[in-house]
Curated annotation (Swiss-Prot):
Family of this protein: Belongs to the UPF0246 family.
Protein name: UPF0246 protein ABBFA_001173
PANTHER family: PEROXIDE STRESS RESISTANCE PROTEIN YAAA, PEROXIDE STRESS RESPONSE PROTEIN YAAA
Taxonomy of the source species: Bacteria, Pseudomonadati, Pseudomonadota, Gammaproteobacteria, Moraxellales
Disulfide bonds: none
Organism, as annotated: Acinetobacter baumannii (strain AB307-0294)
Length: 259
């Protein structure tokens, strides 16, 4: 199976890296085109476009200016260690074993507004460019039009490389919209995580994001390859709810913790 996760806004370029192994992103010629567009934006325009503060906008204007497609450890780090957010708290990549990282390199992918599709060990320079950003570019009015079928085609290549016909969608809707489902040459399964609150089960963003990371870790550590195997996921109190699941959507619930 091949699992997809979203990137994170928060980045970590400080923590000591557990490995010096790396690969280069495969869609950099497209990234460079986006950088050319972004470099023409002022900090104020970035602030408005991305709905961020002037401080963050200025930081990212500097990042766009300094970006270059020659990545090494002086200016970049591996994607799986660079992203720091709720999903990556669940994934906890720094404590994965070498064999787990090897498996992840083949079976885990991170969607990205700037880099398209990243493997765990792909080096990346720091950036902020969310997939939902309405950035006018040479191919359209937003990043979905820019990436078009490029990400989808790369996913299909990666599925073929591991001889898999199963794609596990652990990404947010914003990022998964960059994938053309109709052209994916595989069965697609989406795990959904519901937490109980005031007696009702619902998606609670913080918990759901972390759970997606936990599921990615579960897939990696157990080297899963069948959709049926996902149902055994029981980390941090989640359990499979067969009654509310379907072939395409696997529902996992967690009961409210009593004080």
């Amino acid at each position: 199976m091949l699992a997809l996760i979203s990137p994170a806004k928060t980045l970590d370029y400080e923590t000591a890296l557990p490995t010096d192994e790396f690969t280069q992103p495969r869609l950099l010629e497209h990234s460079a085109q986006l950088i050319d567009v972004c470099r023409k934006l002022s900090a104020s325009e970035i602030a408005s476009l991305m709905s961020v503060s002037e401080k963050i906008a200025t930081l990212n204007a500097d990042r766009f200016r300094d970006w270059k497609p020659e990545f090494d450890f002086s200016n970049a780090r591996q994607a799986i260690y660079a992203f720091k957010g709720d999903v990556y708290t669940g994934l906890d990549a720094y404590h994965l074993k070498d064999k787990d990282i090897d498996f992840a390199q083949q079976h885990l992918r991170m969607l990205s507004g700037l880099y398209g599709l990243l493997r765990p060990l792909d080096l990346m320079m720091p950036y902020r460019l969310e997939m939902g950003t309405k950035l006018k570019n040479t191919r359209g009015h937003n990043l979905y039009e820019f990436w078009d079928d490029i990400i989808t085609n790369q996913i299909n290549e990666d599925l073929a490389a591991i001889k898999s016909e199963l794609l596990v969608n652990l990404a947010s809707d914003e990022y998964y919209k960059s994938v053309n489902e109709k052209k994916i040459k595989a069965e697609i399964v989406k795990p959904v995580f519901l937490d109980q609150k005031n007696g009702k089960y619902k998606v609670i963003s913080f918990y759901a994001k972390k759970a997606r990371g936990l599921m990615a870790r579960f897939i990696i550590e157990n080297q899963l390859n069948k959709a049926e195997d996902l149902k055994a996921f029981n980390t941090e109190g989640y359990y499979f709810d067969a009654d509310n699941s379907s072939a395409k959507e696997l529902v996992f619930k967690r009961d409210e913790q009593q004080a």
